[in-house]
Amino acid sequence: MTTSPTPFKTVRDLVRHAVSRFSQAKLAFGHGSDNAFDEAVYLVLHTLHLPLDTLEPFLDARLAPDEIDAVLAVIERRATERVPAAYLTREAWMHGHRFYVDERVIVPRSFIGELLDDGLQPYVEDPELVGSVLELCTGSGCLAILAALAFPNASVDAVDLSADALAVAKINRDNYGLDERIALYHGDLYAPLPQFKWIDPAQRYDVIIANPPYVNAGSMAELPAEYRHEPEMALAGGADGMDIVRRIIGEARRWLQDDGVLVVEIGNERANVEAAFGGLELVWLPTSAGDGSVFLIHASELPAVAG
């Protein structure tokens, strides 16, 4: 193990160093924090096994040489390799809930999560009456888990094309003890789901949610290095970002109850959504990012499915 540089003795020293190092490296944020200070505090506290919400009492705590070395190693990996913090710590937080993540999945970040805090009300009249939910492009399974918590009487089906992603989703599902309420399906959007779930109207879903790949080709080419560590298939949405969204909307009607809703997150692609689906009655939902990141469509407004 290397000898710790003498200038670093306390938590305060390491946080200050991390902020300087991250600023010097011109890092991009957006995988759990949006600035150098918050990311520095998180990585320092996590590496030292300290409570993530308690910085002040530990600021002037003197650290052992091996603790300093461990923190410096994490800071350098973040600064030089541009690895997202969540991959370094093997965890991500969403609305107070901790989830396991690694490089097999995109780092979870979704405004649908905050909408689930209120059970999608008022668009869902009573969350306790929701009996079934489908999440497409589940990735690490975070939204499926938040949906199960928001709709306590619902069964949740979660689908992903990546077997690796589903392995991570299984870890999270099992960590929350939801293996009897969340079923995982490996396949392309609706394809792996049992056909009786649309043939029998009683089996159709009350809610479908999706945070699909939606980054358009131009934006993909300009993504910061941090995003290059994530699976490309979880980000890239084709020329206008709408390749997967078109397919989700195109078949959603047959899988939804007559009074069901489809909720889709599209990041900064509102203009492309409106260009592609201008004939549909889209309801843009207010989130902490404004009203241009998540839209809802009532089942009655969705296009009919042939066949």
Curated annotation (Swiss-Prot):
Per the UniProt record, one Pfam family is MTS
Enzyme class label: transferase
For this protein, the record's InterPro entries field holds: DNA_methylase_N6_adenine_CS, HemK-like, Ribosome_uL3_MTase, SAM-dependent_MTases_sf, Small_mtfrase_dom
Q: Which GO terms describe its cellular component?
A: cytosol
Q: Which GO terms describe its molecular function?
A: nucleic acid binding; protein-glutamine N-methyltransferase activity
In terms of Gene3D superfamilies, this protein maps to: DNA helicase RuvA subunit, C-terminal domain, Vaccinia Virus protein VP39
Q: Name one GO biological process term.
A: methylation
UniProt key word Glycosyltransferase: no
Catalysed reaction(s)? Answer: L-glutaminyl-[ribosomal protein uL3] + S-adenosyl-L-methionine = N(5)-methyl-L-glutaminyl-[ribosomal protein uL3] + S-adenosyl-L-homocysteine + H(+)
HAMAP family from the entry? L3_methyltr_PrmB (MF_02125)
Family in the record: Belongs to the protein N5-glutamine methyltransferase family. PrmB subfamily.
Report the protein name in the record. Ribosomal protein uL3 glutamine methyltransferase
